[in-house]
Amino acid sequence: MDVEERLSLVLRYPTEEVITVEELRELFQGGYKLNHYIGFEISGFIHIGTGVVSMSKVVDLQRAGVRTTVFLADIHSWLNNKLGGDLDTIRRVAVTYYVETFKRIIEVLGGDPDATRFVLGSDLYHHNDEYWFLLMDITRHLTLSQVRHSLTILGRKMGESIPLAYLVYPPLQVADVFALGAHIPHGGIDQRRAHILARQVADKIRFYPLTVDGKRIKPVALHHRLLPALNISSKPSSKEELSELKMSKSIPQSAIFVHDSPEEIRQKVAKAYCPPREVEYNPVLELLRIAAFREERKTPLVIKRPEKYGGDVEVWKYEELEAMYKEGKIHPADLKAVTAEALAALLEPVYKFFQGPGAKLLEEMRNIAITR
């Protein structure tokens, strides 16, 4: 695979941006062994945004020859009071439900679950004096204003009254990038500010400098799209507003969970926001794109329609679908029907896992109080 083919894998949907593309191209051209990481708070059930969208980029990176890592951020979750702030519960859920779910999704998407490393935050920090020196070093090079500005990482507006612990979170996240040796830190577009901080301190820190071939570099940040909540009532006016209106595991009606049954998926999609002719921030279109158009199709997607409205339609590419919907040639009800079926087919192996060997994991999650 040549450099441009590798680059196209990284840049394809659902990638929103890479900072910077030219830096990544140079790293690929150099033939360096590159490390990736994406971090997750440990909280409630994994939905399709956290699971399928994120892991689709992990699979793309695997194919591009990048070593991938999923970071299970137990300490961050504790600081942010997830799962009631119970650290033991957070850790247990991280290494059981989260690991098993992500592995199943990677496999469903055509990747290799064994090729991705899973790292628990506590394990990275344990008996690691250099990490704590790194963290302190990072704080020496950040201002209070910079840290407060990045607090949307936590889903909290910086003008609110917040515990001091929350101010530790952004430097901690920046430190993880370097401690993991991540040339490509990855997350949703809502993680952008933290990754910008990492780039800003990259040439200043003394501990865990990020290097290739002995040369210090800045991390190349990779950000994927956020799935809008199913129950949004209007189009977001900005990316910042979208981060507030993304799918949320603590609001069940806003999200499709990866363990949902086909009938639950149909019911949720049927109620989803899907205005006629509107293609921007349309959660149903986004869901169909990730479920049916991530890979080049070998057969057309068939959208069933009544004969009086023109009969069935065959679609090969997402761009065709979007254009037809924008022109009003596809009714929202027909779009919802095909989306629900495509999602149910994609997630069927995950659903069956949680109906069988993974049932105990799901039951434990149902018994845990979920905090947002």
From Swiss-Prot:
Residues recorded as binding ATP, renumbered to this chain, are K249
Gene Ontology MF terms in the entry:
ATP binding; tyrosine-tRNA ligase activity
Where is this protein found? Cytoplasm
- The keyword Nuclease is assigned to this record: no
Q: Which reaction does it catalyse?
A: tRNA(Tyr) + L-tyrosine + ATP = L-tyrosyl-tRNA(Tyr) + AMP + diphosphate + H(+)
GO biological process annotation, one example: tyrosyl-tRNA aminoacylation
GO cellular component terms? cytoplasm
What are the entry keywords? Answer: Aminoacyl-tRNA synthetase, ATP-binding, Cytoplasm, Ligase, Nucleotide-binding, Protein biosynthesis
Q: Which Pfam families does the protein's record reference?
A: tRNA-synt_1b
Q: What superkingdom does the record give? A: Archaea
The keyword Cell inner membrane belongs to this UniProt entry's keyword annotation? no
Subunit text: Homodimer.
Q: What does this protein do?
A: Catalyzes the attachment of tyrosine to tRNA(Tyr) in a two-step reaction: tyrosine is first activated by ATP to form Tyr-AMP and then transferred to the acceptor end of tRNA(Tyr).
Annotated protein name in UniProt: Tyrosine--tRNA ligase
The record lists the organism as Pyrobaculum calidifontis (strain DSM 21063 / JCM 11548 / VA1)
Q: Quote the gene name from the UniProt entry.
A: tyrS
